[in-house]
Protein backbone atom coordinates (compact mmCIF):
# COMPACT_ATOMS: atom_id res chain seq x y z
CA UNK A 1 0.00 0.00 0.00
CA UNK A 2 1.42 3.34 -1.08
CA UNK A 3 1.33 6.25 1.39
CA UNK A 4 -0.46 9.39 0.15
CA UNK A 5 1.79 12.24 -0.94
CA UNK A 6 1.82 15.68 0.67
CA UNK A 7 -0.23 17.27 -2.13
CA UNK A 8 -3.08 14.79 -1.61
CA UNK A 9 -3.05 15.35 2.14
CA UNK A 10 -3.05 19.14 1.73
CA UNK A 11 -5.92 19.03 -0.76
CA UNK A 12 -7.91 16.77 1.55
CA UNK A 13 -7.38 19.09 4.52
CA UNK A 14 -8.39 22.16 2.50
CA UNK A 15 -11.62 20.50 1.38
CA UNK A 16 -12.37 19.38 4.93
CA UNK A 17 -11.88 22.93 6.18
CA UNK A 18 -14.28 24.24 3.54
CA UNK A 19 -16.88 21.70 4.63
CA UNK A 20 -16.56 22.71 8.30
CA UNK A 21 -16.81 26.46 7.78
CA UNK A 22 -18.65 28.39 10.50
CA UNK A 23 -20.19 30.70 7.90
CA UNK A 24 -21.78 27.87 5.91
CA UNK A 25 -25.00 26.77 7.61
CA UNK A 26 -25.39 23.65 5.49
CA UNK A 27 -23.20 20.74 6.53
CA UNK A 28 -22.22 18.69 3.53
CA UNK A 29 -20.27 15.52 3.24
CA UNK A 30 -18.30 15.69 0.03
CA UNK A 31 -17.41 12.49 -1.75
CA UNK A 32 -16.65 9.72 0.73
CA UNK A 33 -16.74 11.96 3.80
CA UNK A 34 -12.99 12.32 4.07
CA UNK A 35 -12.62 15.35 1.84
CA UNK A 36 -12.06 13.32 -1.31
CA UNK A 37 -14.51 14.12 -4.06
CA UNK A 38 -15.09 13.33 -7.66
CA UNK A 39 -13.83 15.86 -10.17
CA UNK A 40 -17.33 17.02 -11.19
CA UNK A 41 -18.23 18.27 -7.69
CA UNK A 42 -17.51 21.90 -6.92
CA UNK A 43 -17.83 24.06 -3.85
CA UNK A 44 -20.46 26.79 -3.74
CA UNK A 45 -19.09 30.15 -2.59
CA UNK A 46 -19.88 31.23 0.94
CA UNK A 47 -21.92 34.42 1.02
CA UNK A 48 -20.58 37.40 2.93
CA UNK A 49 -22.70 38.35 5.90
CA UNK A 50 -22.39 41.46 8.01
CA UNK A 51 -23.49 41.52 11.61
CA UNK A 52 -23.80 44.78 13.55
CA UNK A 53 -22.44 44.30 17.09
CA UNK A 54 -23.06 47.86 18.33
CA UNK A 55 -19.71 47.67 20.10
CA UNK A 56 -19.49 51.47 20.30
CA UNK A 57 -22.44 51.49 22.74
CA UNK A 58 -21.91 50.08 26.20
CA UNK A 59 -24.31 47.49 27.56
CA UNK A 60 -26.30 48.12 30.73
CA UNK A 61 -24.85 46.99 34.04
CA UNK A 62 -24.52 43.16 34.43
CA UNK A 63 -25.32 42.44 30.75
CA UNK A 64 -23.04 40.53 28.40
CA UNK A 65 -23.33 40.12 24.64
CA UNK A 66 -22.73 36.54 23.43
CA UNK A 67 -22.54 34.75 20.09
CA UNK A 68 -23.91 31.23 19.63
CA UNK A 69 -21.30 29.59 17.40
CA UNK A 70 -23.66 26.85 16.22
CA UNK A 71 -26.47 29.12 15.02
CA UNK A 72 -24.59 32.38 14.55
CA UNK A 73 -27.19 34.24 16.62
CA UNK A 74 -26.35 36.95 19.12
CA UNK A 75 -27.99 36.83 22.53
CA UNK A 76 -27.63 38.74 25.78
CA UNK A 77 -27.21 37.42 29.33
CA UNK A 78 -27.97 39.36 32.50
CA UNK A 79 -25.49 37.86 34.96
CA UNK A 80 -27.32 39.34 37.93
CA UNK A 81 -30.51 37.32 37.42
CA UNK A 82 -29.48 34.76 34.76
CA UNK A 83 -31.95 36.03 32.15
CA UNK A 84 -31.06 35.22 28.54
CA UNK A 85 -32.73 37.26 25.78
CA UNK A 86 -32.31 37.85 22.06
CA UNK A 87 -33.38 41.51 22.12
CA UNK A 88 -30.63 44.05 22.62
CA UNK A 89 -31.20 45.52 26.12
CA UNK A 90 -29.92 48.91 24.90
CA UNK A 91 -32.67 49.12 22.28
CA UNK A 92 -35.39 47.81 24.60
CA UNK A 93 -34.50 50.38 27.27
CA UNK A 94 -34.51 53.25 24.75
CA UNK A 95 -37.85 52.18 23.28
CA UNK A 96 -39.75 51.75 26.58
CA UNK A 97 -38.08 53.24 29.67
CA UNK A 98 -41.12 52.41 31.87
CA UNK A 99 -41.00 48.69 31.11
CA UNK A 100 -39.79 47.77 34.60
CA UNK A 101 -36.26 46.88 35.57
CA UNK A 102 -35.97 43.52 33.84
CA UNK A 103 -33.45 45.17 31.53
CA UNK A 104 -32.60 47.80 34.11
CA UNK A 105 -29.31 49.48 34.65
CA UNK A 106 -29.68 49.70 38.40
CA UNK A 107 -26.26 48.94 39.83
CA UNK A 108 -25.33 48.28 43.39
CA UNK A 109 -23.18 50.76 45.31
CA UNK A 110 -20.22 48.51 44.66
CA UNK A 111 -20.76 48.68 40.90
CA UNK A 112 -21.48 52.39 40.84
CA UNK A 113 -18.43 53.30 42.91
CA UNK A 114 -16.32 52.85 39.80
CA UNK A 115 -18.47 55.32 37.89
CA UNK A 116 -18.48 57.78 40.80
CA UNK A 117 -14.69 57.76 40.96
CA UNK A 118 -14.49 58.29 37.21
CA UNK A 119 -16.92 61.23 37.37
CA UNK A 120 -15.13 62.91 40.24
CA UNK A 121 -11.76 62.51 38.57
CA UNK A 122 -13.08 63.95 35.30
CA UNK A 123 -13.93 67.16 37.15
CA UNK A 124 -10.34 67.65 38.24
CA UNK A 125 -7.49 68.78 36.02
CA UNK A 126 -6.17 66.39 33.35
CA UNK A 127 -2.73 66.14 34.97
CA UNK A 128 -4.14 65.21 38.39
CA UNK A 129 -6.40 62.66 36.72
CA UNK A 130 -3.42 61.06 35.00
CA UNK A 131 -1.39 61.01 38.24
CA UNK A 132 -4.30 59.47 40.16
CA UNK A 133 -4.80 56.86 37.45
CA UNK A 134 -1.09 55.98 37.40
CA UNK A 135 -1.02 55.60 41.19
CA UNK A 136 -4.04 53.29 41.11
CA UNK A 137 -2.50 51.19 38.34
CA UNK A 138 0.80 50.89 40.22
CA UNK A 139 -0.98 49.80 43.41
CA UNK A 140 -3.00 47.20 41.51
CA UNK A 141 0.12 45.88 39.79
CA UNK A 142 1.97 45.56 43.10
CA UNK A 143 -0.93 43.68 44.67
CA UNK A 144 -1.19 41.35 41.68
CA UNK A 145 2.56 40.71 41.75
CA UNK A 146 2.41 39.82 45.44
CA UNK A 147 -0.39 37.33 44.81
CA UNK A 148 1.08 35.78 41.66
CA UNK A 149 4.74 35.37 42.65
CA UNK A 150 5.77 31.91 43.82
CA UNK A 151 8.63 31.62 46.29
CA UNK A 152 10.49 28.78 47.96
CA UNK A 153 9.56 28.22 51.58
CA UNK A 154 10.56 25.53 54.03
CA UNK A 155 8.69 23.99 56.93
CA UNK A 156 10.66 23.31 60.12
CA UNK A 157 7.94 20.97 61.41
CA UNK A 158 7.66 18.49 58.53
CA UNK A 159 11.07 19.20 56.91
CA UNK A 160 9.59 19.88 53.46
CA UNK A 161 10.23 22.57 50.87
CA UNK A 162 7.34 24.10 48.92
CA UNK A 163 6.74 26.55 46.11
CA UNK A 164 3.99 28.74 47.52
CA UNK A 165 2.52 32.17 46.72
CA UNK A 166 4.48 34.92 48.40
CA UNK A 167 1.64 35.80 50.78
CA UNK A 168 1.10 32.25 52.11
CA UNK A 169 2.46 31.91 55.65
CA UNK A 170 1.35 28.39 56.65
CA UNK A 171 2.64 25.01 55.50
CA UNK A 172 0.22 23.37 53.04
CA UNK A 173 0.95 19.96 54.60
CA UNK A 174 0.97 20.50 58.37
CA UNK A 175 -0.19 24.14 58.77
CA UNK A 176 2.96 25.12 60.71
CA UNK A 177 4.58 28.47 59.98
CA UNK A 178 6.73 28.48 56.84
CA UNK A 179 10.24 29.88 56.61
CA UNK A 180 10.31 32.08 53.47
CA UNK A 181 13.71 32.23 51.80
CA UNK A 182 12.85 35.45 49.94
CA UNK A 183 12.69 37.49 53.19
CA UNK A 184 15.42 38.48 55.62
CA UNK A 185 14.93 36.77 58.99
CA UNK A 186 16.34 37.61 62.39
CA UNK A 187 18.87 35.21 63.90
CA UNK A 188 16.43 34.14 66.63
CA UNK A 189 13.89 32.62 64.23
Curated annotation (Swiss-Prot):
Family annotation (InterPro entries): WW_dom_sf, WWC/KIBRA_Hippo_Reg
Boundaries of every WW domain copy: 57-91
Stretch list, region Disordered: 90-148
Keyword Amino-acid biosynthesis set for record: no
Keywords: ATP-binding, Helicase, Hydrolase, Nucleotide-binding
Residue ranges annotated as motif EAR: 50-55
GO molecular function, one term: helicase activity
Disulfide bonds: none
Tissue expression per record: Mostly observed in roots, flowers and siliques. Expressed in cells differentiated from epidermal cells such as trichomes, stigmatic papillar cells and guard cells, as well as in tissues undergoing abscission and dehiscence.
Gene disruption phenotype: Increased cuticle development leading to ectopic cuticle biosynthesis in trichomes.
Its biological purpose: Negatively regulates the cuticle development by interacting with the HD-ZIP IV transcription factor HDG1.
Assembly and oligomerization: Interacts with BHLH122/CFLAP1 and BHLH80/CFLAP2. Binds to HDG1.
PANTHER family recorded: BOMB/KIRA PROTEINS, PROTEIN KIBRA
Protein name as catalogued: Protein CURLY FLAG LEAF 1
Amino acid sequence: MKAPNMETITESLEKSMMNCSLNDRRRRVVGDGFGRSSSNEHMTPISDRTLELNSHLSLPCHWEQCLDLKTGEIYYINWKNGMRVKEDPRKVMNADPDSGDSYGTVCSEEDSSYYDSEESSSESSPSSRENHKEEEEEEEEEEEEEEDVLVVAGCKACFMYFMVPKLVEDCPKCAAQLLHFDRPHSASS
